[in-house]
């Protein structure tokens, strides 16, 4: 490349250099000088013109680094996005944020619906007939079936109370994956952190309807506040959310039971507060987030593991299980033993089922939408029924959807390109670690070892579980969801009893967040990316391999690095972050850093946070 010739008042720039730079400079030089023509040899600009460009404000004058750092830095990008998506009005979109991820996910969602509708026009085999039945059930108003399930719920509850069978009730709830996230005893199956090829039962914390759990103590704190505090915006907002939550519970009661007071809103609210109090217990020393408990020791923590496991479906009770908190387990089990049959707790037990049943009933869905999506998340419009049905379809037919989506949209050229890019970026990452000045020799050695073994999985997860052909109904979504959940629970139990290999039942590719009602597993048709420390793997789903995240047409390596390159480096960096560094190169729970390494890492991270907070 030739040298740029510089004179006191004039700068000469080669045409090819100008072409490279003009995409970076906000306004091309030619607009400032008002020249009519750009010659092939040079483009003449004065120093004064360059100074004008540098001094020109690139944001609204009211936006400064001190009052709005994010918008100051990203002003042009945000402006371009608004222009790009201006055709999507608030009345048309059903998602909260307008960005490349949501726009692309909406595109993929519609492609999935199209795939389903094309198949069910003329189903050719049993699976396609089952797909048709389930899809129809998820978009059909089934009030008669809903009331049948509601009646059955009361019969089931009364039976457990009559038999004084707390552990049977808890087992019954935990068989239902859609409901158990609200249960005080929350069971799941997870990888054994000390042996990635084994699974273990985990007893953990529940989740709550309100994301900000401090709101459950609102009525305890309110009397202690001054008038000045009550006039603050934060107090008024908290009060609004709490009242809307109580109204939401009351609306469900009124819609389902009329004037009968079956579910008392304050009873549900107070039970959840009692559960939160149990989380604050601190009587047991040496507690951790990964406790192993032998079945003969479970009674020490007021937990009847043997009875609970049998209620789940175990024929032979496992000898050991994992617990997120011994303090919580001990306190919440005592709370349950003393109170589970009281009227207050009956409101809670009915509520946790009705909450989920209403979401999958078209006649009732507006009630949970108003609180969970509109008020808490700001979603402007209900999700279209066919798009919402994809949650249930992904749950019950993930293998089918994955197969059909891959057949239609797999791009081998993109897959190979991303793999090669990943390999090159790993080399750069290893070079950075090699040149690192603050890691200990131990930390540096383990980091390089981990990067040598990190893998990339592109497109679709390996060993996706085939969809069972169960006896689904075409007019009862709740029945179908529960039927599949029971089947899945049985398979998870088989993982623990060594009847099947973990590789045969990889449920990682079909996880649903039932609290948020969104796909959070590694489905190939979600627009996201992942790093999993237990297998030391980066995963890029097929749905991510499309515009704007990757395109190989005339936009250059800079564009590719900004999108898919940035995604790959972001995910691979998780292998060495605060959480990823807890696992070795083979995915086993083992620190790869020394204590000094971790202290230095934390200090650097905090310094970066402070730097941003200074300007924010």
Language model regions located:
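Compositionally biased low-complexity segments enriched in polar/charged residues
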Residues: 1-8, 12-45
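Extracytoplasmic/secreted envelope proteins and their assembly/folding machinery
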Residues: 63-66, 70, 109, 113, ...
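Pocket-edge structural micro-motifs
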Residues: 73, 205, 542
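Beta-sheet entry/capping signal
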Residues: 68, 198-202, 528, 536-538
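Extracellular/luminal recognition modules and glycoprotein regions
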Residues: 45-106
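Noncatalytic, helix-rich "gating/capping" subdomain that lines the substrate-entry/channel surface
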Residues: 105-425, 461, 473-474, 478-479, ...
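Secretory-pathway/luminal and periplasmic proteins that interact with or process carbohydrate-rich
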Residues: 77-80, 276-285, 454-465, 575
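Intrinsically disordered, low-complexity linker/terminal regions across diverse proteins
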Residues: 45, 89, 268, 295-298, ...
């Amino acid at each position: 490349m030739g040298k740029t010739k510089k004179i006191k008042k004039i700068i000469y720039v080669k045409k090819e250099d100008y072409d490279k730079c003009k995409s970076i400079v906000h306004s091309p030089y030619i607009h400032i000088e008002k020249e009519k023509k750009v010659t092939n040899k040079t483009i003449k600009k004065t120093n004064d013109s360059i100074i004008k460009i540098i001094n020109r404000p690139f944001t609204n004058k009211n936006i400064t680094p001190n009052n709005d750092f994010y918008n100051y830095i990203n002003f042009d990008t945000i402006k371009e996005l608004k222009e790009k998506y201006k055709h999507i009005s608030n009345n048309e979109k059903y998602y909260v944020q307008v960005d490349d991820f949501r726009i692309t996910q909406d595109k993929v969602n519609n492609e999935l619906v199209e795939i389903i509708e094309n198949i069910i026009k003329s189903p050719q085999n049993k699976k396609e007939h089952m797909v048709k039945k389930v899809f129809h059930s998820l978009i059909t108003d089934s009030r008669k079936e809903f009331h049948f399930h509601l009646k059955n719920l009361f019969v089931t509850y009364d039976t457990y109370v009559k038999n004084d069978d707390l552990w049977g009730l808890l087992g019954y709830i935990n068989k239902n994956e859609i409901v158990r996230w609200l249960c005080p005893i929350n069971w799941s199956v997870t990888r054994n952190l000390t042996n990635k090829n084994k699974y273990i039962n985990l007893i953990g914390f529940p989740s709550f309807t309100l994301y900000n759990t401090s709101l459950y103590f609102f009525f305890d704190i309110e009397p202690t506040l001054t008038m000045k505090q009550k006039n603050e915006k934060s107090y008024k907002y908290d009060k609004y959310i709490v009242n809307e939550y109580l109204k939401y519970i009351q609306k469900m009661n009124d819609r389902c039971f009329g004037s009968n007071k079956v579910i008392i809103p304050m009873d549900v609210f107070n039970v959840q507060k009692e559960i939160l109090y149990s989380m604050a217990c601190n009587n047991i020393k040496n507690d951790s987030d990964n406790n192993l408990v032998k079945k003969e020791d479970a009674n020490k923590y007021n937990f009847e593991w043997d009875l609970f496991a049998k209620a789940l479906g175990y024929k032979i009770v496992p000898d050991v299980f994992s617990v997120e908190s011994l303090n919580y387990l001990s306190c919440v089990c005592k709370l349950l033993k003393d109170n589970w049959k009281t009227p207050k707790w009956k409101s809670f037990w009915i509520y946790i089922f009705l909450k989920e049943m209403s979401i999958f009933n078209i006649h009732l869905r507006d009630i949970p939408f108003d609180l969970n999506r509109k008020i808490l998340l700001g979603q402007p419009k209900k999700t279209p029924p066919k798009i919402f049905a994809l949650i249930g379809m992904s749950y019950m037919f993930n293998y089918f959807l994955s197969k059909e989506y891959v057949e239609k949209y797999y791009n081998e050229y993109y897959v190979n390109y991303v793999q090669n890019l990943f390999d090159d970026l790993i080399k750069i990452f290893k070079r950075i670690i090699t040149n690192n000045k603050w890691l200990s020799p131990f930390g540096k050695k383990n980091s390089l070892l981990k990067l040598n073994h990190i893998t990339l999985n592109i497109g679709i997860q390996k060993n996706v579980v085939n969809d069972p052909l169960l006896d689904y109904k075409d007019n009862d979504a709740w029945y179908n969801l529960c039927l599949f959940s029971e089947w899945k629970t049985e398979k998870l139990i088989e993982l623990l009893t060594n009847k099947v290999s973990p590789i045969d039942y990889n449920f990682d590719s079909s996880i649903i967040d039932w609290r948020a009602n969104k796909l959070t597993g590694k489905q190939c048709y979600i627009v996201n990316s992942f790093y999993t420390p237990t297998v030391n793997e980066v995963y890029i789903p097929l749905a991510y391999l499309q515009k704007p995240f990757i395109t190989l047409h005339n936009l250059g390596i800079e564009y590719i690095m900004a999108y898919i390159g940035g995604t790959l480096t972001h995910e691979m960096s998780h292998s060495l972050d605060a959480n990823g560094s807890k696992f070795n190169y083979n995915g086993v729970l083992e620190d790869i850093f020394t204590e000094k390494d971790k202290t230095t890492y934390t200090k650097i991270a905090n310094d970066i946070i402070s730097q941003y907070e200074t300007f924010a």
